[in-house]
Amino acid sequence: MSDSDSKRIDVEAPERVEQHELQVMPVGSTIEVPSLDSTPKLSKRNSSERSLPLRSYSKWSPTEQGATLVWRDLCVYTNVGGSGQRMKRIINNSTGAIQPGTLMALMGSSGSGKTTLMSTLAFRQPAGTVVQGDILINGRRIGPFMHRISGYVYQDDLFLGSLTVLEHLNFMAHLRLDRRVSKEERRLIIKELLERTGLLSAAQTRIGSGDDKKVLSGGERKRLAFAVELLNNPVILFCDEPTTGLDSYSAQQLVATLYELAQKGTTILCTIHQPSSQLFDNFNNVMLLADGRVAFTGSPQHALSFFANHGYYCPEAYNPADFLIGVLATDPGYEQASQRSAQHLCDQFAVSSAAKQRDMLVNLEIHMAQSGNFPFDTEVESFRGVAWYKRFHVVWLRASLTLLRDPTIQWLRFIQKIAMAFIIGACFAGTTEPSQLGVQAVQGALFIMISENTYHPMYSVLNLFPQGFPLFMRETRSGLYSTGQYYAANILALLPGMIIEPLIFVIICYWLTGLRSTFYAFGVTAMCVVLVMNVATACGCFFSTAFNSVPLAMAYLVPLDYIFMITSGIFIQVNSLPVAFWWTQFLSWMLYANEAMTAAQWSGVQNITCFQESADLPCFHTGQDVLDKYSFNESNVYRNLLAMVGLYFGFHLLGYYCLWRRARKL
């Protein structure tokens, strides 16, 4: 065993800590914790030595004294797929610590494991990730509570473009803040965040998308993402490539905001790719990764000194960040040599004095966590989230606003539906009298009404869940709401349109075509058309969640549509269906609706005009003759209505299950 190994304090995980060289400190003791940054800051704003923080371990709380995040011997494996479910190690025995007031840059070449390490430390790793090692924040193992005490700013900004900045922050505040926060307090928090992030003038501006005339700029969208994460005043903030896609001025303003947060005691970890020299100077700590291993941890100035001591000198007037990343990167054509060079630096850092100082801090933090019970646990557990029904209400209200403000989803379809009702009514006007030709016209009008409320509504919702799936996954991982709340809220937001739209359609179409003028016939027809549209939409939602893309969903849905159309009862009698397709009649809402609407039109009709009858072309004399022609039974009307209600809930249950399963896998 080497000297460095023999001097290392071997402290186990908090649940099984053993006492070796450290003396257990009594509760209430104050100890000086060594800082990982013992060098002057490169930024001109702070050229003096940083004072070493003092922590009273009897008052260890996330709000009063910040958060210290430590991890030891951390290995992270991800599933790379294949029949054998092969696991690939992304992070290799990483150890580190971040103290309150630290703005740390996590750097490395592409594929070095930056995002994987940060998402693991934030307890936001993807499903299927295997984590080994110890990760603690203020002496407590990380867990789902990290979503409450930390913020995570993703590289790509996901918003609902139809909402304004103020509306988005309002919705997020309702979902993130403690239920005991009053309306006035919530308003003041949002106003303060708008002022801090420079978004006060854009509060009423819609976030927008690429097709909108007035949208937020890239810098404003990034600041809005920061404002959302700062709502619950996190003690630790994780930022994944926060400057990506921003111009130099916006990037500088953003990093300046991070610097100010760190000065107030927030612990901040950022992955950053090729920052400018000016941006790099704002970070008081840097961690370099190479193929999942730690190549250096410490101040930027010490990083340059460490590399220089091993033969890598940064040229004059050269960006230090580019130099450090370039040394650890893999050069095309020299892959093996580049990897050996990077691994050599990792090996040298592992036995350096900086690594020993880091290990001492990590072991000390883990050991001191066993000195007593700290208020940190109490403060974490005292958080009271929003009640489930309020979460559901917020998600439903947001989905409803999106539908109302998106013309492609609601208003254009509504206008199209009214236009089609007038066209259909005009085509069948005066043709539905009780005669032999009238029978064909009535059945044709009924089928058109069914098909018009089947195909377009069903295909129009195929993009509903795939379009919002990335945002849904991000927010559910943050614990804002559940899969069931999200699915039910979106369906409930669709429901008013799914009732009003077919009702207006059937009112216009029914009276223009001159169908049977009895309350019973109209009522059954209206209920059938409303149910047809809702069942078709439910089927579309099921296929929307069952497949990853709209083209794939359509590829499977189109053949099923043809089967339902053929078995609707107008093209072929149900009794004559082949045995292989006998089951389709139980799933065909078009058949249920056609039978019920036909029965409502012809039951009780005793006289149908027949001008000429022959053996080859017999006439329909009564309404019962029409029902017998299609093998329909007037006693099945209410059964068919209930069957369509059952299909509606059945398709939605399948849709929810598919969405839940997809979310669980990712």
UniProtKB/Swiss-Prot annotation:
Sequence ranges on the Extracellular membrane side: 439-444, 512-518, 573-639
Class of this enzyme: translocase
Pfam families: ABC2_membrane, ABC2_membrane_7, ABC_tran
Cellular compartments annotated: Cytoplasmic vesicle membrane
GO CC annotation: cytoplasmic vesicle membrane; pigment granule membrane; plasma membrane; presynapse
Glycosylation, residue list: 607, 633
Annotated ranges, domain ABC transporter: 69-316
Cytoplasmic topology ranges: 1-417, 466-490, 540-551, 661-666
S-S bridge residues: none
Key words of the record: ATP-binding, Cytoplasmic vesicle, Glycoprotein, Membrane, Nucleotide-binding, Pigment, Translocase, Transmembrane, Transmembrane helix, Transport
Alphabetized SMART domains for the sequence: AAA
GO biological process, one term: aminergic neurotransmitter loading into synaptic vesicle
Predominant localisation class: membrane
The keyword Transmembrane is assigned to this record: yes
Record field: catalytic activity: L-kynurenine(out) + ATP + H2O = L-kynurenine(in) + ADP + phosphate + H(+)
Tissues in which the UniProt entry reports expression: Expressed in the eye, specifically in primary pigment cells, secondary pigment cells and retinula cells (at protein level).
Record's function text: ATP-dependent transporter of the ATP-binding cassette (ABC) family which transports various molecules including bioamines, neurotransmitters and metabolic intermediates. In the eye and probably in association with w/white, required for the transport of the eye brown pigment precursors, kynurenine and probably tryptophan, into pigment cell granules. In Malpighian tubules and pupal eyes, involved in kynurenine transport. Probably in association with w/white, plays a role in zinc storage granule biogenesis in Malpighian tubule principal epithelial cells.
Oligomeric and partner information: May form a heterodimer with w/white.
Record's protein name: Protein scarlet
Source organism: Drosophila melanogaster
Name of the coding gene: st
